[in-house]
Every structure is written in structure tokens, then in C-alpha cells.
Amino acid sequence: MSEICPIAASSVPLYPPRVTPPPKPLHLPESFVKFLRNPLLTIPEAVYHEPLVVLRGPPAIVWVTDPALVKIVLVDQCDDFPQDPLLRRVLGGLFGNSILTSEGRDWRWQHQTVAPLFRHGEIVRYVPAMVAGAESAIKAWSAAPPGSSHAIDADMLRATYHVICNTLLPGGGAFIGETMKQGTSDYMEGISWSTAYAVLNLPVWLPRPGRRRMRFWETRLRAVVADTIRERHTSPDDHDDLFTRLLGAVDPETGRRMPEERLVDNLLTFLLAGHHTVAMTLTWTLYLLSRAPNWEARVLDEIRQVVASGPVTGEHIDRLVTVQQVLNESLRLYPPLPMMTRYTAKDVDLAGEHIKAGTLIGLPIYAIHRHHRLWDDPDRFDPSRFAPERKTGYSRYQFMPFGAGPRICIGAAFALVEATAMLATLIRAARFESLSVQEPIPVSRVVLRPKDGMPLQVTMRGRAGDDSLASGQP
């Protein structure tokens, strides 16, 4: 890809990089190899066009993309389509029986216990910490020479770690953050192999690359979080943070509190899943705005009108409409969790297809968000899709970056508020430009990330030589 002229790009439709699907379903050996490279490469072209695609395998899978059918799986008959056991097999060593990996009553009481902590009124109290996370990145960029290139994906991971340290674990969070940074990369590298083995139902004892590293970090990370919980229990200081609220949370029906092991399970889930999803959402959004200066100008103009000269606060979040439009379109094109799976607990009929018990059901969020029957010009970056007056133009089951139904990500609202506050803070402070001749490649590693990172040139607004968009004008 040649360098794009910003002025020309503002009037030219933007079609950012996408995964090219195979024209036909893959046979087992090729499917296995492609899955290891990028699980999205195993979703055939038909899934982007048809409401239901049945693959007899091996491996056998039913891809469900029609919103009405998705609703059946996730809501109407959700008991017939429980969470696929492979998630527990792959992630259970780290996350145990958390709200992410548990099922049935075990999931229900945890959800009831934790849900009050993620209501909107509770979330906005943490906006200052979210802004501080963005400002930590701005501080680092300001210290660099003007126009320096930065690894935005790594910077956003650091910034969202900062948010964790100031919302979930003030005081002890910095140490855990450093440990997480060391362990996450090794752990994520082994995920593809362990998932592929689980899909093929290979024995758990069979050697695989990364297995030893994953086991080490499962033990290490769980021990660090358990120690932190014990320290907080014995600390005489008063804390007003998400961690303390989680320790004191009770099931409204039974008055039951979480035992230490479940606290470890859920804290690790929030720590890892929470910050990675927001970090990658910001990474892709900053890239898209670097390629769409017309939308960058609109976003900047709104930020300056709504926020003015002070910091972003909780009162600003709902008024940053254009910022949220851009974020939603980024989440559509690059959903942080690009694929969900369920399985059939019994024989079921779906869209005229008889599906036997034990069949893997694929909910390819990435493909649903780019489905040719559901979206006009689906691969185009167009935030106007999410304008307030067009909210009734799409189903809640065709846009679901955080899932849908009872099992929707419990931290979805927190993530959206965090992304809004941080993006507004970042865009007001800096301009981003993509100078790479190579497009970023979306690859699924639990979350959707750029395969080789996301280098962007960062120029602080107001510095000499930075006239572009200095007043919110293209």
C-alpha cells in the first residue's frame, strides 16, 4: 500500500484491511494449519453471505449468522445451546470457574453478585482514572521528538494497565500490572495451539508448543492475585475501589460472598479480558482515524465543543455522540472478541436443519459484522451507520462486539465508557498518521489484534509544524 494523501483520503471511501476468507470449506489438515495462523482464516466465504452454514467436517460445525437465529441460540433457547466446553478446557487453568467459564447455577450466582458493580452510575465514578490512563500515554509521546513513530498497540496496553491499577487494584496494582505484562504474551502465544487441540478433541496430555509456559503463568498469576486478596483482607486502610467492592459483593438472593478461589478466578478475568479488549479497540480506532481525517476532524470538533478545555468527566460521556459512533464502527469492523461458540445440549432444529446433540455451534462475530445481507457495503468504514437517527436500522443480534443475551460480557458498559473517555482524551491531545507501507493484519489471539503491531506517527497538537486539524478543520 502506498502512502495515502490525507486530503485525498478525506473524500475517498475507506476500506480498511480485512481477513480474506477461503472460497470453500477447508479440509482437516489445512484447517488445522490455518487455525494456528489465525482462526478467522477457517471461516469460509459462504458464512459472510448465508444465514446458516452447516459443515459436516471434520471438524463438524454449524455457523450461525442470521440475527433471528442468533437470538434463538443466545436468548430464546439458550439452555439448549450452553457454552462450549472447549472454552473451559482452554482457559479454565487460568480463569478457573469464573463468570466467563462457568455455567448454569454457578454462573448465575456469580453474575448476580458482580452485576451491581458494573451499572452505569458505578462506572462513571472511574472516568478520572480512565482519563489518567490516556494521559500516561500522552506524557510518553510528549517526551519523544515531534512526529515520532510509536507502537500504538503496546502503548494502549500500557495505558489500559494504568487504568486497571487505578480502578481495580490501587496500591498493589502496579506490581500485578508488571507481572501481567510479562505473562500475558507467553500465555496468549499458546492459546492457538491449545484451542486447536480442544477443537479436534485431542488428549490433554499430548505435548504441544507453549504448554509448559502456559502452565507456569497460570500458577504464577493465580498466586500473585491470591496474595493480593489476602493482603487486602488484612489491610486496615479504607479503600474505595472496584477491588474492595468485589470483595464485599454479595449474592442478592442468598447473601453469599465469593470465596477466595472464585475471587481469584474473577479478578484474573477482569484484569486480562478487560484491559486487552479496550486496548485493542483503541488501537484499531486510532488507526482508522489516521486513515479518515474527515472523521477525525468531526471527532475533534465535538470533543472541543463538549469537553472544552478541562478533562473528560462522567457528565461528558453520553454527549460524545460522534466519538461513540466512531468507536461502534471500529468495534463492528474489528470486534475485540471475534468469535463465540456454543454446543447443542440435545438434538435441535434450526432453520430447517436437524442438528444432533453435541454439535459445535459457531457464532462468528467478525463475519456477522461484515455480513453482506446485514450491512450495506460491509467492509467500508462508515461511522454514520451508528448515527442516533439510524439506531433502529440494525438488530442487536447483528452488532454484538461484546456478545448478547444473558451471557453478554458483564464489563461491556465499563469498556465502552473507558474507550470513550480515553479516545476523547487522546484525540484532543495528538494527531495520528499511518505511514507504513504494509496494512495491519487482523489476527485472532483471544482478542483481535494487529499481527505485527500498529506503528503510527504521533504528533502532539499545538506543536510547531502541526497545523493539520489544529482548529478541528480538515
Q: Can you describe what each PLM-predicted range is?
A:
Residues 6-20, 82-88, 122-280, 298:
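Cytochrome P450 heme-thiolate monooxygenase catalytic core
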Residues 2-105, 109, 128-136, 175, ...:
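N-terminal membrane-proximal hinge/A-helix region immediately C-terminal to the signal-anchor transmembrane segment
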Residues 15-25, 127, 131, 182-187, ...:
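Cytochrome P450 I-helix active-site segment
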